[in-house]
């Protein structure tokens, strides 16, 4: 560039216009039709003063070419491309985003446009990079917040689990204390431990189970042996013993046998077994009944229970001596009728007649006879368990 071209440049209308903009900061300047400035260049003139000052320092440099000193080069960094008043060069839009333009075809023009583009395009691309960075930062922050929430949630869950464990241990200790109070044990200075309480409870359960099973076995064996008893009630230990009492001077038999009553009488009347049980729940232990060898040839004898009215009607004709004995024990009597009495078998071969008279809450009298004679001595032995009620 020679001095002539530089002089023309400094004296041009465009240069004067730029100086005027720098001094007055006119943002609304509109050029005339002959100055060759477009509306886009006018918009570009509204840039801050600092950028304009930098542009002025660039224009004052002697390294610029005359062809690239048109007004379009002043606003190529912000405009989409403007026409040249001198017609020397034209700026073309290269399709860059955010309106970056490249002007001129000369080497200096390319360098200048590249410099301008480097100053303008990063400002337009920066929002995209900023948005991506902000999204990454938000993602990291959200991950950090999520981790913090998880830690808080884990802490709450740990506290809840500890509370449940404490409640479970309290309930377990209360249950063991209740078990200690129920189980009998020797008092000690310290209370039983949990393992001692469980061991003691196990031993009690085992022993009680053995006792219950033994009782059940005994009851089952008794039912099997006494399956013919009336209503499940039998007269036990009603047997003859060696060396027992003598009936009317007849020696006693050494053989013994257990007897039980039939379900029904020969006359068809039902037998009330409740009167055979004592008040304490035990079965009636009858006195021993003895027989002599002379009585072994006697056939089946019957046992008959009568109401008190029937016994009073038949006392005079059947058992006068036994009647006197029964009057001494509550004016009760019993008679024997061999025609309608069920048999009472002793030792499988011997049978005797047995009469029983029962008073309501007064006393019991028993007489044994061989169709005619009575054995008054047996009465005193048979009612022995009931003497406390007389």
UniProtKB/Swiss-Prot annotation:
Where composition is biased (Low complexity), the residues are 69-78, 122-141
Annotated GO CC locations: cytoplasm; nucleus
Where is this gene product found?
A: Cytoplasm
Q: What SUPFAM superfamilies does its record include?
A: HLH, helix-loop-helix DNA-binding domain (SSF47459)
Cite the record's Polar residues compositional bias ranges. 29-44, 55-64
Name the Pfam families for this protein. HLH
GO biological process entries:
axon development; neuroendocrine cell differentiation; positive regulation of hormone secretion; positive regulation of peptide secretion; positive regulation of transcription by RNA polymerase II; regulation of DNA-templated transcription; sensory organ development; ventral cord development
InterPro entries reported for this sequence:
bHLH_dom (IPR011598), bHLH_transcription_factors (IPR050359), HLH_DNA-bd_sf (IPR036638)
Tissue specificity, in the record's words, reads: Detected in the developing nervous system in the bilateral domains in the cephalic region that later on forms part of the ring gland. Concomitantly expressed in the larval central nervous system (CNS), including the dorsal chain neurons as well as several bilateral clusters of neurons: large, midline protocerebral brain cells (MC), lateral protocerebral brain cells (LC), ventral subesophageal neurons (SE) and lateral abdominal neurons, and the transverse nerves.
- Source domain of life is Eukaryota
Q: Which CDD domains match?
A: bHLH_TS_dimmed_like
Q: Which UniProt keywords apply?
A: Cytoplasm, Developmental protein, Differentiation, DNA-binding, Glycoprotein, Transcription, Transcription regulation
Start-end of Gly residues biased regions? 79-90
Domain bHLH, chain residue ranges per copy = 156-208
List every stretch annotated Disordered.
Answer: 24-163, 312-339
Q: How does it assemble?
A: Forms homodimers via the bHLH domain. These dimers bind the core E-box sequence.
Q: What's the record's remark on domains?
A: The basic domain binds to the canonical E-box (5'-CANNTG-3'), with a particular preference for TA relative to AT or CG in the variable central nucleotide positions.
Q: What is this protein called?
A: Protein dimmed
